[in-house]
From Swiss-Prot:
This is RecQ-like DNA helicase BLM. Disulfide bonds: none annotated. Binds 1 zinc ion per subunit. The keyword Metal-binding applies. It comes from Xenopus laevis (African clawed frog). The record marks 669, 760, 872, 898, 920, 1061 as: 3' overhang DNA-binding.
């Protein structure tokens, strides 16, 4: 291995310590020493053109160039450069020849002496692979920062390029630097020549023709590289370069060369441009200084000697090279075009529609993967017409040739090289010679794109400008014509757009050891949500137009796409509002959760198996997969999801996978029982420890937990049990010591916070779990927590670094409505509303007290509605009985309950939730109302509001013994937030709820766009006028100050009659005859209606202009008297203006929107009838098998089955939620019902469309936590079709459904068993017999016989384990 030469690197590191830590992709400041071009022409020696610095460098006396054999040579002999970090490649020159250093003056005045052309043997380039100098590569640990190399030293017999942020030496010389053929060393048969440099374009022939204005005709990009050829003739180019200086002048040329030297690029002939260019600074968005030179030179327009024929010849050469080389190139194969069109169509599919497809998840993953691959595939990520950046990437193979073309419109020159003529030819490319109008839109365009064909890589460059090229290098136009200054390779394009994307290493360059890319500087927070545009179309950008959205650039585009893109890019900029959602990158709510996405974890395989087999689900909801992966990775998690969002699965699925026991802490026994029943029905070992467990049952559970490998996976406990039971704590300590304590799950975590609506002291003491079990992960879940509550939960539970998963609080299928409450008629109003809107549906009525629950239930029963009361005053057995009857709709349609009911109850078909009294907080109302419509169907949330309830609730808060005054004030604030929600008759109800929880970016036109679920405020007529009522409010405040301030001595000895309630104030303000006081304020509000007057005084209370003080009378009644508020003085001083939304009349509030009567077709009536019959069937089967009827088929699945009206099993299996196992269990009865409606059967296509259509809201939400089943097509149904034609009158389910097993406790059936599984003339067959294609005939058409009787050994009725 070649040894690294000694140098003063350490000294440079000390001089420049900050470079290594800075961003390597930032633009380095211009150094004082720049390179210039000098030439010395000698009749005997080949001219050597190199980069000569103005001053000497500290590394001048050090030689970092070694030969490949590792030996050192002394200066000034030519040396071989060792490759450091793969940024330098070996140069083979013959030693003994001194470097040709010449003065700039000779170069400027243009010596016309000819050079001796090198021989073919000496000029032959030695091809080297990527790993040619691998042995001389120094590891990154030793050379981690090349920024400290300042190689502005005179390079001996070689040319300086740029490597990293410093110039790099390379074999090839850009024609920008010199268009001569240079010979550095004498002829030698064994040396690789570094002196023959010229442009190539796939071996295009270039004619030798004298040029008068080379400065105006060399449209060479700084990104282009040179390839050494054999036997080249330099004489014409030499004379052209010398002749060109007469037009420009010495000063201009020197200025140009000084500026251009900062962006020159050189590449070696092995197609491995090992260099790292400087990146543009973020703040350097202005035009570079060279543009000023170009602008000055535009005044000197020199006519070109190039004719149209030259342009045509060049165009012909371009057509034969590659698709990306010319605009007139042949259209690629139809297959490639078709594939690109398919990709474009897939990209245009909206995400909402993509999720509905059966393969939508996989297709979305592939589409995202394709976008990422395209974004990283090449630096040429823009569309062909996108000329906003200039960047270049290296080849992946050393055998690839670099071919360049500069197509300059209207005065620009086409520069190409040929291996045949060995000379350069400059052809003028006319605009009309181009097949498309692309050049007309590329006045300031940059390189278009790159396309790989075979083993070659073609670069197509387009220089812009009509007249800008005529007196300046075409290099100026192609690189610096736009407003940004870019350098190739690893450059980060600069854009004024707010949606810029950090540059990523191209995948094509992974084989190239370009190791200067600093991945540590990558910050995922820099990524925007809408920066990934996968459209090939992009606008043509000039120096005055910067694209709003950078595009992903596809590496392979045909000319058809180029022309299409050019035609579409006539606009200045891309309008973000016109971007399709399919082109936008899917929004990531939290980019930090990106590492938890996907299925590449060790637990993923087992997780998906349990997910499908145990829970019967096939698709995760939002944030579920990320939360589950984070939980299984041992992270603390805080999950904030709305009701019905699938919180339970986030800990139940990890609990089944993780070794050990998951402790779930839940506040209510009803919630615990419901969850455990559901898990055991899924054959998941779960149990609970509550106060109603007997000692024997508790001892059995503790015994199971003490075993070496406990069967129990999830243990549900109450917070009171955790805080009070020392036996439970010791059991958890034992599990912890044996590393069998998987995690703690705190459900309904809002109970932890004192700022929440349902604070419980025992929840707050759960922080002892973190103290005792520090290494055990913790998960907190809630559906209602504003930012303050969320922060308090994390603080109380000592979750320092949790993964926070949140979702939108919007429930798009709920309809919110507030009605005025008449206290004595509220029960009758509820009956009237239920009979009108949901006469046969399940619902909940929340009441404030136990007495109201009983009264409401009695009233409903008298009016003919099946209603039962549920509150804490009932015994546990009675509560369980009421809950079970209501869940299964067993003679209980409506349940009248306090707020303690329903938390976590998973009944999907609750069609309405009525609040007969005002809730205590917005959080409580959101949670309680969210128990409606969990199946995605439209449901109602009705609230009867009366301000009288405020006083009652205030008294309840005041009488609470727990908490201090600060806590009580928090509850008062929560209460008045709820009052504000009810009093606000202008703003959308949905918007108010979401704003309370901090979700302020919700669509304000949601209700207008979805009138079916629009709230009452959005549906009502906007007959509101904003009035300035500051004067009236001032009169009210002064009246209160004079009459109701006894404490301040202003009562003037008046009696208790000065204690005025809010209703008394309204009477006085309106001038009512029943007013207590008929002076002062009396009658000043006569212009107000009573409704508006009441609203005005409530507004003053909410705005704290006046306040209410609570008193308890001798009769133990709460009365609120008016007093001055904290903002009253501001009104009196004129510092506060009060606006009031005045309504025309109170009747507009009380009017209900009449239900729209639609003409239903006969088939729709049959669908409703069938749905009702199927629901009754599920209820009967649920009673028999001891499960909830919606666990047989959920309500959404029943609705889709009813819509199909098809008895065919093949059709039913295509419906979401219908599986083979369920058809085996319940198919016979289901088919019997559907056969009654077979004449109304829809085609299969319509059924599939209805069951999975994107427009159906319920279809998107129907996959509840444990109710969805995968709907893959059954194999045995398809095999049955091969056995022959199917009988018309005989159902598939006429044959036996028995499971024949031995005495192993599995399912079994005899011939005389249940009619659901045995028919009269059928024989016993196992399920496997159907899969194999066997079919048993039936002599008679099956009918609905006696309901099946459960057997004790059926596995879906009894878990496989037994612990009691």
């Amino acid at each position: 291995m070649a040894a690294l030469p000694q140098n003063n690197l350490q000294k440079q590191l000390e001089l420049f310590p900050a470079k290594g830590t800075s961003n390597k992709l930032s633009l380095q400041k211009t150094k004082s020493s720049v390179f210039t071009f000098k030439k010395k022409c000698s009749p005997n020696v080949s001219a050597s053109t190199g980069f000569i610095p103005f001053q000497q460098h500290v590394l001048k006396d050090k030689n970092v160039n070694v030969k490949q054999d590792g030996t050192h040579t002394a200066l000034p002999k030519a040396t071989e450069r060792n490759k450091i970090n793969c940024f330098f490649t070996p140069v083979y020159t013959k030693s003994g020849q001194p470097p040709q250093v010449v003065a700039l003056k000779d170069h400027v005045h243009g010596n016309d002496s000819a050079n001796k052309p090198p021989s073919t043997e000496d000029a032959a380039s030695k091809k080297t692979g990527i790993n040619t100098s691998f042995g001389s590569v120094t590891s990154l640990e030793e050379w981690d920062d090349l920024d400290d190399f300042d190689t502005s030293v005179s390079p001996p017999k070689s040319h300086a390029g740029k490597g990293g942020k410093t110039p790099q030496k390379c074999k090839n010389t850009s024609p920008v630097a010199s268009f001569k053929i240079q010979s550095i060393s004498p002829e030698g048969p064994t040396t690789e020549k570094h002196d023959c440099a010229k442009l190539l374009y796939d071996n295009n022939e270039v004619a030798s023709e004298p040029r008068k204005n080379l400065h105006a005709k060399t449209a060479e990009s700084p990104d282009q590289s040179l390839v050494c050829l054999a036997s080249v003739e330099p004489t014409n180019l030499e004379r052209d370069m010398c002749r060109n200086t007469d037009y420009l002048g010495t000063d201009d040329l020197e200025h140009d060369q000084e500026t251009l030297s900062q962006v020159l690029i050189e590449e070696e002939d092995d197609c491995e441009p090992d260099f790292i260019p400087p990146s543009p600074s973020d703040e350097s968005l202005s035009s570079p200084p060279v543009l000023k030179v170009i602008s000055a030179q535009r005044k000197h327009k020199v006519s070109s000697l190039t004719d149209v024929n030259d342009c045509e010849n060049t165009t012909d050469h371009l057509q034969g090279q590659s698709v990306s080389t010319s605009l007139d190139s042949k259209v690629p194969s139809q297959l490639l075009t078709l594939m690109l069109e398919i990709c474009d169509l897939v990209d245009k599919i909206p995400i909402s529609e993509l999720h509905v497809l059966s393969c939508g998840l996989d297709l979305k993953k592939k589409r995202d993967m394709r976008k990422r691959l395209l974004s990283n595939d090449s630096v040429f990520r823009s569309s062909p017409a996108d000329s906003s950046t200039v960047s270049l990437t290296s080849c992946t193979s050393s055998t690839q040739n670099r071919d360049f073309n500069v197509n300059a419109p209207k005065g620009a020159e086409s520069l190409s090289g040929s291996s045949v003529s060995k000379v350069f030819k400059f052809n003028k490319l006319a605009v009309h010679d181009i097949g498309t109008k692309e050049s007309e839109n590329s006045a300031n365009s940059a390189p278009n794109f790159m396309e790989k064909i075979g083993n070659k890589t073609s670069f197509s460059f387009r220089a812009g400008g009509d007249s800008i090229m005529e007196n300046s290098f075409n290099f100026h136009s192609s690189v610096l014509s736009n407003s940004r200054f870019n350098t190739p390779q690893n450059e980060k394009p600069i854009s004024s757009s707010t949606c810029t994307r950090p540059y990523s290493q191209p995948i094509d360059d992974m084989d190239n050891p370009d190791l200067d890319f600093d991945i540590d500087n990558f910050d995922i927070e820099d990524l925007d949500d809408i920066h990934c545009l996968d459209s090939p179309a992009a606008p043509s950008v000039s120096s005055k137009n910067v694209p709003q959205y950078p595009t992903i650039r596809e590496a392979q585009l045909d000319s058809r796409n180029k022309e299409k893109n050019t035609r579409n890019n006539t606009g200045d900029t891309t309008n973000p509002s016109l971007l399709s959602d399919s082109l936008l990158k899917p929004q990531i709510e939290n980019p930090a959760h990106e590492r938890f996405r996907g299925f590449n974890f060790p637990h993923s395989k087992e997780m998906m198996k349990i997910f499908h087999k145990k829970f019967g689900l096939h698709r995760f909801r939002t944030n579920q997969l990320e939360a589950i992966n984070a939980c299984l990775c041992g992270e603390d998690c805080f999950i904030l999801m709305p009701t019905g969002g699938g919180k339970s699965l986030c800990y139940q699925l990890p609990g089944c996978i993780s070794p050990g026991v998951t402790i779930v802490i839940s506040p209510l026994r009803s919630l615990i029982v419901d969850q455990v029943q559901k898990l055991t029905s899924l054959d998941i070992p779960a149990t609970y420890l509550t106060g109603d467990k007997t000692d024997a049952e508790a001892a059995s559970i503790y015994l199971q937990l003490s075993k070496k490998d406990p069967i129990i996976k999830l243990l549900y406990v109450t917070p009171e049990k955790v805080c009070a039971s020392t036996r439970l704590i010791s059991t958890m300590e034992n599990l912890y010591e044996r590393q069998l304590l998987a995690r703690f799950v705190i459900d309904e975590a809002h109970c932890v916070s004192q700022w929440g609506h349902d604070f419980r002291p025992d929840y707050k003491r759960l922080n002892v779990l973190r103290q005792k079990f520090q290494s055990v992960p913790m998960m907190a879940l809630t559906a209602t927590a504003n930012p303050r509550v969320k922060k308090d939960i994390l603080n109380q539970l000592k979750m320092t670094k949790p993964q926070i998963f949140t979702m939108s609080f919007n429930r798009d299928n709920l309809k919110y409505e507030v009605l005025p409450k008449k206290p004595k008629r509220v029960a009758l109003d509820c009956v009237e509303w239920i009979k009108k809107h949901h006469p046969n549906d399940s619902g909940i009525i929340y009441c404030l007290s136990r007495h109201e629950c009983d009264t409401m239930a009695d009233t409903l029963q008298k009016e003919g509605l099946a209603a039962l009361a549920y509150h804490a005053g009932l015994a546990d057995s009675n509560r369980d009985y009421v809950q079970h009857k209501w869940i299964n709709q067993d003679d209980c349609q409506v349940i009248c309950a306090t707020i303690a009911f329903g938390m976590g109850i998973d009944k999907p078909d609750v069609r309405y939730v009525i609040h007969a009294s005002l809730p205590k907080s917005v959080e409580g109302y959101y949670q309680e109302s969210g128990r409606a419509g969990r199946d995605g169907e439209t449901s109602h949330c009705l609230l009867f509001y009366s301000y009288h309830d405020v006083t009652r609730i205030r008294r309840l808060i005041q009488m609470e013994k727990d908490g201090n005054s600060h806590t009580k004030q928090t509850h008062f604030n929560n209460l008045y937030s709820m009052v504000h929600y009810c009093e606000n008759v202008v703003e959308c109800r949905r918007m108010q709820l979401l704003s309370y929880f901090g979700e302020n970016n919700f669509n304000p036109n949601f209700c207008k766009e979805h009138t079916q679920v629009a709230c009452d405020n959005c549906l009502g007529k906007k007959n509101y006028k904003s009035r300035d009522v500051t004067d009236d409010v001032g009169n009210i405040v002064r009246f209160v100050q004079d009459n109701c301030s006894l404490v301040q001595g202003r009562g003037k000895g008046r009696s208790n009659n000065t204690r005025l309630t809010l209703n008394m104030m309204v009477d006085i303000f309106l001038g009512s005859k029943s007013a207590k006081i008929q002076t002062g304020l009396f009658g000043k509000g006569a212009a107000y209606s009573r409704h508006n007057a009441e609203r005005l005084f409530r507004k003053l209370v909410l705005d704290r202009i006046i306040d209410e003080e609570l008193y308890i009378t001798f009769n133990d009644q709460a009365v609120a008297y008016v007093k001055m508020g904290e903002r009253a003085q501001a009104v009196l001083n004129g510092f506060l203006k009060v606006d009031f939304q005045d309504t025309e009349s109170a009747s507009s509030i009380r009017k209900q929107k009449a239900s729209v009567v639609t003409n239903t077709s006969q088939r729709e009536e049959m669908v409703k009838k069938c749905q009702a019959e199927l629901t009754e069937l599920c209820k009967r089967l649920g009673k028999i098998f001891g499960v909830h009827y919606f666990n047989i088929f959920n309500t959404a699945t029943i609705r889709r089955i009813a819509e199909s009206l098809s008895p065919e099993p093949e059709v039913l299996l295509q419906i979401d939620g219908v599986t083979e196992d369920k058809l085996d269990k319940y198919g016979a009865e289901l088919i019997d019902v559907l056969q009654k409606y077979s004449e109304w059967t829809l085609p299969v296509e319509d059924i599939c469309q209805k069951s999975g259509g994107p427009a159906n809201v319920s279809a998107r939400r129907s996959n509840s936590d444990h109710d969805d089943e995968s709907c893959d097509k059954s194999s045995y149904f398809s095999s049955n079709n091969k056995k022959g034609p199917k009988r018309k009158n005989s159902s598939y389910f006429g044959k036996s459904k028995k499971r024949k097993t031995g005495g192993d406790g599995q399912q079994s059936r005899s011939k005389n068993g249940n009619s659901s599984y045995a028919r009269k003339n059928s024989t016993a067959k196992t399920s496997s017999s159907y899969i194999s294609g066997s079919k048993t005939g039936a002599d008679k058409r099956p009918g609905f016989m006696a309901p099946p009787m459960p057997q004790p050994n059926r596995r879906f009725l009894k878990p496989s384990y037994s612990m009691f």
